[in-house]
């Protein structure tokens, strides 16, 4: 059934080569490229493939590049603990938002990171989620298959589900049925296989590191699991609150073991947080904006607005059916409905930005959850509630009075909104949408009123599912881009850069070229990043010297079309920026760059120009002098600056001067080999010098000279420097996270303990049998 639902929902993907990969939806790499659209079901009205897609930038600029970077690393048998292509060197899995260690990214990377791999791995996860959801409704809650189908439709076609199944934001939502089912089945029946399944699902969920939605889903999962446990408890000792607390305590076994198994992933994150800067802190500075009344209408049904912008709608029929079934539900079902209503309505109010309610979302901690993330909870609550509602209708019917009064109230509200829209001339609420919404209301009322006849209830339950399917399915955007891999046919400027970049970097300005993180896709190092957990000194350097006019959460150039070139040329030299890649839509920026740098390549077809910086410092070079005097904007290859006392002491002991003599000789430094996490440099120094590597300095990097460890200092504000002796030597820089090593020990120990427990328990049970 799960596979059938997937095929019916996405025939253009399964049969016509449609893509669930977001590559091509945004004009990244080549803004002038045209991609074919495929479609089976009609859209009314016709829509662009990206209409209704939430947080498209996170998919195109974070998730897709992450899959391709991880694939490149796997293919080259390299670690992806460090990303040398982003922000002059940046953290790997600790960036969280791009999910590098998630099961989804790892599987996509394993299968080649193509649009086809992305698409079918996404479909596989959806099918698995739908299977677990069906089993949860049929086996755990015993609601029946018709009700299970209703829940699956709500899971897939409510606003958050429809938009989020192939995104980093929606990844925890896709996994929630798997975690919920395995957890509740283990609590219901026990057994080693179910225990291991629950732990594996929970561990995969932890590795899916889009934290805001992840935490919201965990709250929902444990709330539902605890409610089911409490309702199923055989003992009558103590209050329901005590039974709930005992149940929750028992559930904690699963996350405790899963946390131990995934320590290799989360322990480095906490280590990175200790050194994090303003980019992470800015998440706590968000505010939930107020929302117009028409947006609130669109949350019920997209029919009620002409806007194509995504909103986490839940539908009209689901709300009416859930409300009408409440009074006839079983006690356990009422408890679950009450929890779903409390969580779902609260989340929906925060998502809508309702006055007064939104002030709760602005409390410390909660304010880090963006408004659209709250709709994940309302979608999950609708999924569970609708399945219960359809099951109740099939068994006992529903409350006709509630349905009638609710239908009248909702219908009156829609009519009133439409009349206000007409009187004020807004043209925001379409007539067709208003009529369609009223038709759904009438259909729901008729189904509920007819359910008073016991002989018709099974058929009416099926009719209720059909009504929900028609309503929610009509909201979907059925247009898809054909599968495309942008790196398969790169534009001419990308090929030029790949041939000429060598050990240098690029500055990229604009969204139509190599907007971050797309440098990592093509193996072209860049100085920007669209990931968080940025190295604080680098973030400060970038915002002060590279792009002072466009400060935001991410380090980007061209987020605003009117941005101008204000980069300090010396700062670009420090970072070994050999080429400036400019999207020609940024006319003021391009004009200023053209005055200072010579044109190296003009890709008229892609509307991208590449300028050459002939004064860029080599990626590795010897500097004859080191000074503790900080002179911002006066960086030089001849005199390196630092505030690192140990490095200054080492330089003084080696006889390295603080100024440059007239006849100073520098020697040479040549990079012999470079991977994601190591750099080997052949050094020939005429006298003791400072070896500068123009990669971002971070505390997890170590260095050795001919196998002997040496101290690394941060020089020229952001890059690495060590003192090297006279003569020939081999310098090796290595990235090693001690936190990850400790985490790996914990993970292996947990795995061993779990295996031992499973083995001993299984043998004991066999002996008893």
Describe each region flagged by the PLM.
Residues 1-15, 25-45, 246-250, 445-465, ...:
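Start-transfer (signal-anchor) and selected internal transmembrane alpha helices
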Residues 7-18, 74, 78, 95, ...:
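Membrane-interface helix-loop junctions at the exits of transmembrane helices
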Residues 14-175, 209, 213, 297-306, ...:
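Active-site lumenal/periplasmic loops and adjacent helix-entry segments of GT-C-fold
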Residues 22-41, 466, 470-666, 680-682, ...:
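Extracytoplasmic
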Residues 28-53, 60, 65-74, 247-328, ...:
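Periplasmic/ER-lumenal interhelical loops and adjacent helix-loop junctions
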Residues 78, 82, 344, 528, ...:
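Active-site-proximal, structured, solvent-exposed surfaces of multi-pass membrane proteins
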Residues 110-136, 316-324, 740-765:
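Selective detector of the "anchor" transmembrane alpha-helix that sits immediately C-terminal
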Residues 150, 168, 174-175, 182, ...:
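Contiguous transmembrane helix-bundle modules in multi-pass membrane proteins
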């Amino acid at each position: 059934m799960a596979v059938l639902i997937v095929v019916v929902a996405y025939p253009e993907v399964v049969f016509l080569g449609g893509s669930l990969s977001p590559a091509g939806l945004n004009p990244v790499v080549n803004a002038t490229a045209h991609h074919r659209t495929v479609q089976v079901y009609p859209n009314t009205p016709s829509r662009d493939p990206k209409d209704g897609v939430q947080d498209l930038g996170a998919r195109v600029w974070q998730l897709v590049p992450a899959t391709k970077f991880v694939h490149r690393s796997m293919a080259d048998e390299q670690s992806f603990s460090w990303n040398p292509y982003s922000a002059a060197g940046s953290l790997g899995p600790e960036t969280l938002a791009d999910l590098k260690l998630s099961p989804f990214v790892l599987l996509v990377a394993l299968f080649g990171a193509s649009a086809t791999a992305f698409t079918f791995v996404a479909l596989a996860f959806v099918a698995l989620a739908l299977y677990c959801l069906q089993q949860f409704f049929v086996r755990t809650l015993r609601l029946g298959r018709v009700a299970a189908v209703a829940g699956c439709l709500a899971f897939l076609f409510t606003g958050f589900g429809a938009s989020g199944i192939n995104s980093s934001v929606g990844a925890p939502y896709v996994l929630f049925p798997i975690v919920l089912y395995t957890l509740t089945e283990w609590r219901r029946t026990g057994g080693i296989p179910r225990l291991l399944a629950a732990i594996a699902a929970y561990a995969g969920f932890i590795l899916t590191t889009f934290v805001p939605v992840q935490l919201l889903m965990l709250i929902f999962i444990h709330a539902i699991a605890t409610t089911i446990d409490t309702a199923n408890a055989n003992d009558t000792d103590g209050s329901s609150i005590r039974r709930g607390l005992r149940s929750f305590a028992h559930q904690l076994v699963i996350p405790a073991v899963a946390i131990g198994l995934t320590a290799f992933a989360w322990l480095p994150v906490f280590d990175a947080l200790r050194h994090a800067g303003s980019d992470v802190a800015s998440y706590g500075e968000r505010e939930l904006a107020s929302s117009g009344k028409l947006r609130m209408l669109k949350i019920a049904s997209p029919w009620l607005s002409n806007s194509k912008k995504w909103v986490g709608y839940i539908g009209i029929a689901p709300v009416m059916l859930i409300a009408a079934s409440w009074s006839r539900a079983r006690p356990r079902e009422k408890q679950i409905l009450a929890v779903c209503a409390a969580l779902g309505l609260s989340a929906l109010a925060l998502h809508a930005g309702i006055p007064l309610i939104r002030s709760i979302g602005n409390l410390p901690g909660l304010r880090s959850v963006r408004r659209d993330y709250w709709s994940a909870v309302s979608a999950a609550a609708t999924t569970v509630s609708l399945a219960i509602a359809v099951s109740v209708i099939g068994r006992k019917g529903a409350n006709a009075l509630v349905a009638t009064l609710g239908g009248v109230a909702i219908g009156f509200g829609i009519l009133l909104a439409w009349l206000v829209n007409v009187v004020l001339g807004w043209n925001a609420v379409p007539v067709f949408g208003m009529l369609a919404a009223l038709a759904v209301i009438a259909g729901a009322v008729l189904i509920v009123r007819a359910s008073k006849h016991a002989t018709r209830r099974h058929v009416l339950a099926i009719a209720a599912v059909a009504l929900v399917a028609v309503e929610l399915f009509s909201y979907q955007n059925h247009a898809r881009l054909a599968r495309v891999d942008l790196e398969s046919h790169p534009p001419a400027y990308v090929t030029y850069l790949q041939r000429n970049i060598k050990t240098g970097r690029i500055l990229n300005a604009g969204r139509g070229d190599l907007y971050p993180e797309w440098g990592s896709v093509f193996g072209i190092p860049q100085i920007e990043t669209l990931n968080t957990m940025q190295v604080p000194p680098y973030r400060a350097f970038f915002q002060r010297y590279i792009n002072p006019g466009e400060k935001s959460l991410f380090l980007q150039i061209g987020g605003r079309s009117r941005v101008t070139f204000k980069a300090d040329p010396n700062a670009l030299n420090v970072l070994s920026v050999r080429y400036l890649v400019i999207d020609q839509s940024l006319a003021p920026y391009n004009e200023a760059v053209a005055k200072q740098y010579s044109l190296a390549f003009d890709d008229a077809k892609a509307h991208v120009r590449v300028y050459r910086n002939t004064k860029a410092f080599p990626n590795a070079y010897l500097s004859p002098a080191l000074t503790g005097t900080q002179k911002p904007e006066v960086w030089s290859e001849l005199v390196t600056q630092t505030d690192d006392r140990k490095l200054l002491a080492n330089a003084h002991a080696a006889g390295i001067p603080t100024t440059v003599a007239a006849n100073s000789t520098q020697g040479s430094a040549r990079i012999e080999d470079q991977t994601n996490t190591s750099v080997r440099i052949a050094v020939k120094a005429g006298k003791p010098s400072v070896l500068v590597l123009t990669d971002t300095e971070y505390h997890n990097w170590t260095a050795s000279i001919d196998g002997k460890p040496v101290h690394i200092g941060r020089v020229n504000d952001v890059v690495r420097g060590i003192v090297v002796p006279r003569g020939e030597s081999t310098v090796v820089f290595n990235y090693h996270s001690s936190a990850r090593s400790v985490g790996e020990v914990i993970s292996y120990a947990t795995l061993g303990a779990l295996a031992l427990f499973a083995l001993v328990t299984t043998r004991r049970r066999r002996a008893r049998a």
